[in-house]
Amino acid sequence: RTRAEAAGVLLAMGVLTLAGYLGLGLFATRLAARGFGPRHMYLAGWALNLAALVAIVLRIPGAPLWWCVYGFGAAANILAFTVLNEGFPSALAGRSNTAVNLTMFAGSFAAQWGIGVLADALRAAMALSTADGLRGAFVTVLVMVAAAFAWFLAGWKRYAAPPAVARA
């Protein structure tokens, strides 16, 4: 890939991420009124991320498309604030939102740094190319994301509140 092609993929991924945010903003209330609440939307976005990451790691043809799907699904991460608040009394909403915000920022930094460190370590230890080192690091990310997804699903019934029905 050339730099221009990579830039085009990043632009498309960014546009689709913004489209995901716009879609959540436009349709979340209507979907909640039909029983598809924030937890469901969060799950759907996470499932898209997971499916796209599997496709990327397995080198399923169409990598630019898979990165765009990944970006679109990532928009649902904003719903972590709403989903987390389902498990706390409303008086603690500020604290839980602050905690998830700090965790997201710190986790994003740690993940980006960790992917680079792991990719470099794999390259050095196994004489891999840069692409193969990154692929190995992304396999680790995939395993961690899949484990977190399974944990989220396991706690679904325990923490899920019925979606609030919007009044028209």
Language-model-detected regions and their locations in the chain:
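A late C-terminal transmembrane helix in Major Facilitator Superfamily
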Residues: 21, 89-124
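Loop-to-transmembrane helix entry
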Residues: 1-16, 132-139
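Structural signature of the two symmetry-related core transmembrane helices
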Residues: 38-54
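A membrane-interface helix-boundary motif in multi-pass transporters
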Residues: 37, 117-143
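Hydrophobic core of transmembrane alpha-helices in multi-pass small-molecule transporters
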Residues: 62-79
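Helix-to-loop junctions at the C-terminal end of transmembrane segments
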Residues: 21-36
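Intracellular juxtamembrane helix-capping segments at the cytosolic ends
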Residues: 76-89
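Multi-pass alpha-helical transporter architecture, strongest
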Residues: 56-57, 138-168
